Amino acid sequence: MPAVPADRPMHAVRIWLAIIAGLIAVMVLVGGATRLTESGLSIVEWKPITGTLPPLSVEQWTQAFDAYKTIPQYRELNAGMTLAQFKTIFWWEWSHRLLGRVIGAAFLLPFLWFLWRGDLGGGLKRRLWIIFGLGALQGAVGWWMVASGLSQRVEVSQVRLATHLVLALLIFAGIVWTLRQLTPRPAIVAPLRLRLTAAVLLGLTFVQLYLGALVAGLRAGRIYNTWPQIDGALIPSAARLWFEQPWWKNLFDNHLTVQFDHRMLAYALWALAVLHAIDAWRARAAAGGALALAVAITLQAALGIVTLLYAVPIGLGLAHQAMAILVLTLAVLQLARFSPGVVQTAQHAAAPSLGQPAQGRG
């Protein structure tokens, strides 16, 4: 029997969202390279429209370089930098911002087209508007992050950097979740504990991504480059972990505490992922997804250790970030397996709204 014509719009929507997810993943990696190459403050202005074009003449390049020379990073870290060296860091930041503009256009224009055609159901339409709003917010958060390094600091705030990264990956996860739900299939029948552990794994993955961004922002991966010991012990002394006052500042500013937290949560994530895989295998429910997630977290932990031991060279740092995106994707998909997939075209009058349970086992 031929495919139902009403499903054709959803096929186009799925392709579109998959492209957007891929572009976001690329942008996150370019952002990681921008951070690792210390390029994020090379453009000291935020011009959403006119900033699309890079400098096109010697005079424009000189103006951009002179603007960079006014900030503390140049004066304290890069004094004596040549114009050729400046161009290298400029292109990283400019590429990162350009990708943001491309993603915005690639999301908005097809979205408006689908809205005009009436292809999107109410639930999907609302969700996509939320995703678009988060994307617009992300641009503002990016400038908020950059602004933190323009007056008194020689780098951006690690807290703002972590916020910027996690928001990008929250948007990415929302798109992946939506893609999975747009694939028409029933939810997997599974014990409640499997659903709960899948949800906890996803939540802890986001916390770990935040901690990883703090490590990157503080350059904390370039110190304490031993494993399994850190600062000469398996568990550092409380005096070293909590010396800043008030105590909670250590969670964000203390290099030792931030790296230690990142390590400890990695161990907890790995243990929970393995237990989840064993439980899923015994319950015969989403066992393949659980195993894939456990393997990915195992590989990510091993890669993180190697990256630490080599003091975060750019190649290993980017590989670690790419693997983190894969872990997040698998964690989202694993939780989504316990939620129903639905078709969301306006023509599917009989289809449940996005997020409404469907019956069946798969």
UniProtKB/Swiss-Prot annotation:
Main subcellular localisation? membrane
List cellular component terms (GO). Answer: plasma membrane
Q: Is Metal-binding tagged as a keyword? A: yes
Question: Which reaction(s) does its UniProt entry say it catalyses?
Answer: Fe(II)-heme o + 2 A + H2O = Fe(II)-heme a + 2 AH2
Question: Where on the tree of life does the source sit, at the highest rank?
Answer: Bacteria
Q: Which UniProt keywords apply?
A: Cell membrane, Heme biosynthesis, Iron, Membrane, Metal-binding, Oxidoreductase, Transmembrane, Transmembrane helix
GO biological process terms, alphabetically, are: heme A biosynthetic process
- Residues annotated as binding heme: 262, 320
Pathway the protein takes part in: Porphyrin-containing compound metabolism; heme A biosynthesis; heme A from heme O: step 1/1
Membrane association type:
Multi-pass membrane protein
The entry assigns this protein to a family as follows: Belongs to the COX15/CtaA family. Type 2 subfamily.
Its function, per the record, reads:
Catalyzes the conversion of heme O to heme A by two successive hydroxylations of the methyl group at C8. The first hydroxylation forms heme I, the second hydroxylation results in an unstable dihydroxymethyl group, which spontaneously dehydrates, resulting in the formyl group of heme A.
Would you tell me the protein name for this molecule?
A: Heme A synthase
Q: Which organism is it from?
A: Rhodopseudomonas palustris (strain BisB18)
